[in-house]
């Protein structure tokens, strides 16, 4: 039996697309209600005032205003949206 088995295809050669995680808005930037500020896996950033936390840990704005990053206890980085009189319509 000098037959040869059919050549199989490689088990490598595929990759998943990137998930587009990270900051979408930076500190001091103006946002509207509903704008996504950060897409993340887990809570690298924590929600502060006037922001919501989605079930996939996305932080989004609840009001229009300016994005503010700050640190609190345990070196946690919090994100808030500060409502300015100039940004309120």
UniProtKB/Swiss-Prot annotation:
<dbReference type="GO" id="GO:0005840">
    <property type="term" value="C:ribosome"/>
</dbReference>
<dbReference type="InterPro" id="IPR001684">
    <property type="entry name" value="Ribosomal_bL27"/>
</dbReference>
<protein>
    <recommendedName>
        <fullName>Large ribosomal subunit protein bL27</fullName>
    </recommendedName>
</protein>
<dbReference type="GO" id="GO:0003735">
    <property type="term" value="F:structural constituent of ribosome"/>
</dbReference>
<comment type="similarity">
    <text>Belongs to the bacterial ribosomal protein bL27 family.</text>
</comment>
<keyword id="KW-0689">Ribosomal protein</keyword>
<dbReference type="Pfam" id="PF01016">
    <property type="entry name" value="Ribosomal_L27"/>
</dbReference>
<feature type="region of interest" description="Disordered">
    <location>
        <begin position="1"/>
        <end position="26"/>
    </location>
</feature>
<dbReference type="GO" id="GO:1990904">
    <property type="term" value="C:ribonucleoprotein complex"/>
</dbReference>
<keyword id="KW-0687">Ribonucleoprotein</keyword>
<dbReference type="GO" id="GO:0006412">
    <property type="term" value="P:translation"/>
</dbReference>
């Amino acid at each position: 039996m000098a037959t040869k088995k059919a050549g199989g295809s490689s088990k490598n050669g595929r990759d998943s697309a990137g998930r587009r995680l990270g900051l979408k808005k930076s500190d001091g930037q103006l946002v509207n209600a509903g704008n996504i500020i950060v897409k993340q896996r887990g809570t690298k950033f924590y929600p502060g005032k006037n922001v919501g936390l989605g079930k996939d840990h996305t932080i989004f704005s609840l009001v229009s205003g300016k994005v503010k990053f700050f640190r609190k206890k345990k070196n946690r980085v919090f994100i808030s949206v500060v409502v300015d009189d100039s940004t309120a319509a």
